[in-house]
UniProtKB/Swiss-Prot annotation:
Biological source species: Oryza sativa subsp. japonica (Rice)
Gene Ontology CC entries for this record: apoplast; plant-type cell wall; vacuole
Record domain SUEL-type lectin: where: 746-828
GO biological process, alphabetically ordered: galactose catabolic process; plant-type cell wall modification
Disulfide bonds: none
Keywords on record: Apoplast, Glycoprotein, Glycosidase, Hydrolase, Secreted, Signal
Similarity comment: family membership: Belongs to the glycosyl hydrolase 35 family.
Active-site residues, Swiss-Prot/TrEMBL: E187, E259
Protein name: Beta-galactosidase 13
Sugar attachment sites: N157, N198, N249, N260, N362, N366, N392, N502, N578, N586, N615
Pfam families noted in UniProt: BetaGal_gal-bd (PF21467), GHD (PF17834), Glyco_hydro_35 (PF01301), SUEL_Lectin (PF02140)
Record EC number: 3.2.1.23
GO MF annotations in UniProt: beta-galactosidase activity; carbohydrate binding
Subcellular location: Secreted, Extracellular space, Apoplast
Amino acid sequence: MKTTMAAAATCLVALLVVVLAEAAGVGCTTVAYNDRSLVIDGERRIIISGSIHYPRSTPEMWPDLIKKAKEGGLDAIETYVFWNGHEPHRRQYNFEGNYDIIRFFKEIQNAGLYAILRIGPYICGEWNYGGLPAWLRDIPQMQFRMHNAPFENEMENFTTLIINKMKDANMFAGQGGPIILAQIENEYGNVMGQLNNNQSASEYIHWCADMANKQNVGVPWIMCQQDSDVPHNVVNTCNGFYCHDWFPNRTGIPKIWTENWTGWFKAWDKPDFHRSAEDIAFAVAMFFQKRGSLQNYYMYHGGTNFGRTSGGPYITTSYDYDAPLDEYGNLRQPKYGHLKDLHSVIKSIEKILVHGEYVDANYSDNVTVTKYTLGSTSACFINNRNDNKDLNVTLDGNTHLLPAWSVSILPDCKTVAFNSAKIKAQTTIMVKKANMVEKEPESLKWSWMRENLTPFMTDEKGSYRKNELLEQIVTSTDQSDYLWYRTSLDHKGEASYTLFVNTTGHELYAFVNGMLVGKNHSPNGHFVFQLESAVKLHDGKNYISLLSATIGLKNYGPLFEKMPAGIVGGPVKLIDNNGTGIDLSNSSWSYKAGLAGEYRQIHLDKPGYRWDNNNGTVPINRPFTWYKTTFQAPAGQDTVVVDLLGLNKGVAWVNGNNLGRYWPSYTAAEMGGCHHCDYRGVFQAEGDGQKCLTGCGEPSQRYYHVPRSFLKNGEPNTLILFEEAGGDPSQVIFHSVVAGSVCVSAEVGDAITLSCGQHSKTISTIDVTSFGVARGQCGAYEGGCESKAAYKAFTEACLGKESCTVQIINALTGSGCLSGVLTVQASC
């Protein structure tokens, strides 16, 4: 079988670099591929990977996240590269803090894992503007992601910058580094047909591949979702909830799944999406059954959209994604443990999968059996794609019960080592506990400051003027959510009008002569809306100030350079009672991006700022107000979150670190999927078939992550809020996130392991030891047959310990209980 040695010459091409690397004790790794797998140092490999995005966590979190990924059975970490984070202004670069990409890749290397570098540099990723810097739109003749010299020049400059940084740090496999694959562009095949210029699109995607390959990185280049017009010098890959039936566009290249969506992102008006552990395991097992070679979880850890990084529009600050590691880095059980069990079984048959001969046999009733054979050894997959029918399947004389919508893996074709629908890992219910720091007051003490709107209530002192209504992204270069549009008109006498503003939003506040006369925001997905407000003009000069706000820029789709935001074109009119309008659209408009508090950097709480506490009386429900309080860091090392219930919309900072936008007043819509969850059947995040949703009718996001590295122990910490729309901070409280209840169900003959996780949490009580069918959910189980013998065994083995393991034997059933499945629930 032919092997493409795309990286085999790396050690020769980059001889000097490698010699230096070897002098430091680092070896050279070759990466090639054939139609069965990647070939690393001459060995065919199954690779199980997971996405962790470095800017969505903190450098202090990276080692623990990567360690947990490795312990979960991962071989590699995959990440995008975030262009607008690294180059926020043209030729001004940022590689500090959570943008220290080299430090992140070194942490991957230190853990002994591989890495997949997805440069893009368009990334989508629910990231602001899909990762593209807004300043690109300032460049004349710019067309994004087309065969267009202005865009290609900037893309090549940034791509080369990242590659050179990686080479300088010896991060590519041929230099002894962890990077085994690199990606150029991202999901371009999804938009090629919408660009109205097929020739330019084709020329662009081939230019991307050629430009990437000229970089001589020594590892294969991939392109995801590029199923047609695929350049010959890249490997095309699949993204989706299921990729078992997908195959690459040509022979000789491996089947790679770059994004297996473990859940879904969240918008401000949507509930939480949950993809079951059973369904993900089903999809992964099918993928490897059907010759899959590399599978990546998107996301393995989602993290947080700190600052203004969330895209959308209307993507929440949380990017939890229902991933195996939750937003804060805690294990999401049973998803983490169930997939870990799957990885172990897949790895146990790795050689058979990548070297063995295979036969697919289609049985009746949507059952498929695949048998891999290598010499005298065999491994089998049995796949039941029915979504409502369990089946008995006979294989080589042995009958196996196969639950609906599941795959069984038999490493010897005789004994089932794993079934995707049977979870043996524990379920952990995470709970939030109020800050229990000693001497912390019962409620936070607040001071406040008005946002200074006065400079913006006239049309003077703007950055510039135009006799037209300009587009917001270009005008502000996205340096702030906010852009002021200001004009004035002379009016004879007093009169009443309706102020009419047509905007592409996402949000608008209108002031006339210094008074707030109206506000509105667009519904998600419909970003053209109108504001109509009754106003009174006085005799003489009248001032109209319109504050337009964006809430994350669009991250997906074609023709980004043509996507508008703000009051571009309007119209803006004053309409009298007779319907006669004064069109202000072509008046002289003064423009200024940002708010006074942003320019003053109030969030840094510099000396000299005048905060008012008004003898303890704090104004509430007043727009454009800054609030400040101090608090002690919660004890221990558990996750810290701040509950912002009672507030409306704004931004939060802790010790000057931007936690992101908050909007707890925006409730999640009621959707049918909130009242139905069954792992069986196709999972989808859009359309009519949604299921397994939670949080309908509740705040879209109430809790906001405060990383431990943002906090100071033993001294006051500062929380500053900019409340844009008017809210009440009196309910704000800090919590620690800890394991509450842990539960496991297992059959007689299996072992049950309970764990309260990290940070020295111990098992405090055994609450349920029930044989039979226990009703309810973990944390609130009831029913079944309580076993005193099982209760005694778990009490003796587990109380006061961080974890424990008990073998389930018939003797534990006790009198009156039938042998079968034992459910155990414990409290931490």
